[in-house]
């Protein structure tokens, strides 16, 4: 089925809230889960708040895509203690399509967007920023283009989880690739690392990183430049 989320109130104060801390096996999922290859959701406006008082240990998660579910965001705000938007690494053949054209995706402790699943994610607008990083990809394809702004605060902690982002370094984009080949195409947008790394790579699988455009906060992205690339470096 298809679902559209929007705040149609005059005050624009509608909010979906995580009312409990993370608890294994009982309160441990996303506030909204898009499950199945025929399931899709578009978020046009509104606010999803999954931040607990101690987010490093108590989360929570915002929107989850599983088993090939698709998510489109054209506006609104998702703020989470852990991942604002995330997939699940168990899904190797079911391809999820995620499109972010506007809005805000925020993590107060970790990475804002976590991509361990198969499929393609395109961020062409909006703001994506996390205390640890903007996007962590373990498998699949990530396209960054348009007016997208992806920022790593470099101050967060990914924790010591046995999977997920556990133990990973902070970066605007972390191409960890622990579950398969990860391809990142940066055609535009802006990447900022307020501290630590702009782009980091894993070693389990060899990632593919192509930079043909965009604006970067340090010159480390230049090593991924392709022929005829047009990039800007604005030091911070």
Which positions does each model-derived feature cover?
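Surface-exposed loop/turn motifs in large extracellular/passenger domains
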Residues: 1-82, 86-110, 114-131, 135-195, ...
């Amino acid at each position: 089925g298809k679902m559209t989320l929007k705040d149609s109130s005059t005050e624009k104060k509608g909010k979906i809230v995580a009312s409990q801390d993370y608890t294994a096996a009982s309160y441990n999922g996303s506030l909204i889960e898009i499950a199945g290859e025929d399931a899709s959701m578009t978020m046009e406006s509104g606010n999803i708040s999954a931040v607990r008082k101690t987010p490093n240990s108590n989360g929570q998660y915002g929107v989850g895509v599983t088993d090939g579910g698709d998510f489109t965001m054209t506006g609104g705000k998702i703020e989470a203690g852990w991942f604002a938007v995330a997939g699940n690494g168990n899904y190797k053949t079911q391809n999820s399509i995620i499109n972010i054209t506007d809005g805000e995706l925020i993590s107060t402790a970790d990475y804002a967007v976590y991509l361990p699943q198969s499929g393609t994610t395109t961020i062409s607008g909006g703001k994506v920023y996390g205390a640890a990083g903007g996007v962590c990809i373990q498998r699949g394809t990530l396209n960054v283009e348009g007016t997208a702004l992806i920022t790593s605060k470099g101050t967060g902690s990914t924790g010591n989880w046995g999977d997920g982002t556990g133990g990973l370094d902070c970066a605007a984009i972390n191409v960890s690739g622990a579950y398969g080949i990860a391809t990142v195409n940066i055609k535009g947008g802006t990447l900022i690392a307020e501290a630590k790394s702009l782009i980091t790579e894993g070693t389990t699988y060899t990632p593919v990183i192509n930079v043909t455009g965009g604006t970067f906060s340090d010159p480390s992205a230049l090593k991924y430049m392709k022929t005829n690339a047009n990039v800007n470096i604005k030091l911070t």
